[in-house]
Amino acid sequence: ANLSRPGTPASFVDTGAWSTKAIAEARHFGEVRVLGSSADSKFDHIPTVDWADADGSSFLHITTNNTIYGTEYESLPDSPEGVPLVIDASSHIGSRPMPLERAALGYAGAQKNLGCSGLCLVFIRRDLLDDPDAPPAPKCLRYATHAKANSLFNTPNSFGVLVLKLVLEWVEAQGGVAAMERLNAEKSTLLYTTLDNSSLFEAHACAGHRSRMTIPFTLGGAPEGERDALTARFLAEANDEGFQGLKGHRSVGGCRASMYNAFPVEGARALTSFMQEFERRA
């Protein structure tokens, strides 16, 4: 609502559940132009888009990491001149260096890499805060309101802010965001290598589009009639070994390994070893 303009479409790329929800909400405020979608292949890749097609839009919106389907933008696009780039970076902000200065507006829930749920980080270009052409919106939903009040327009989530502070101090002590990038690359490479070399396990996301944060996979190499039972057995045995929360999202099924910043490299090594041992017995 903050950037929408009457009679001017907003451009989106549909890469999964969270961008789909954003598109649906944006339609309450005006016309939406979907530049590309990978829905037909269950969002297993980032669709190829001609960014020039966003020319004349009120803004261009992308979801930079897609938790359910395990895809991630490697870089931010070049938005046409005069079209603000808006990014939802909720599920991978803080996982690697990002050229955030290329985005006019970005938002990220804290609950993945920055802290606990109930807190949202927003960064916005200053000229957009005082835009005279901004559409009317409830005061509490305007970014300018919160910026002018130093994020104290209403009582903030003080515990969430404290946890954010502690997490950022921890990240800095580990070597900063660059260190997080190295660790996350090591963890995800371990699992993707195991998946790509397996005749039982299969990654959902296509190579070249894969997320370092969430890695959905199936036991697609199992006979179709045995796949569900074998998946249930794998999840049960994994849980017994201490690997919790591996069940995939209900819209995709299968399994999903979450490897956010706090997940250690040792955990990735242990998981891949267990998967290889399970495949030998299956």
Label every PLM stretch briefly.
Residues 233, 240, 249-282:
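PLP-dependent enzyme catalytic core of the Aspartate aminotransferase-like
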Residues 5-20:
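Conserved PLP-anchoring active-site segment centered on the Schiff-base-forming lysine
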Residues 26, 38-93:
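Active-site phosphate-binding strand-loop segment of PLP-dependent enzymes
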Residues 201-238:
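Conserved PLP-binding catalytic core of the aspartate aminotransferase-like
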Residues 110-193, 206, 282:
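Active-site C-terminal subdomain of aminotransferase-like
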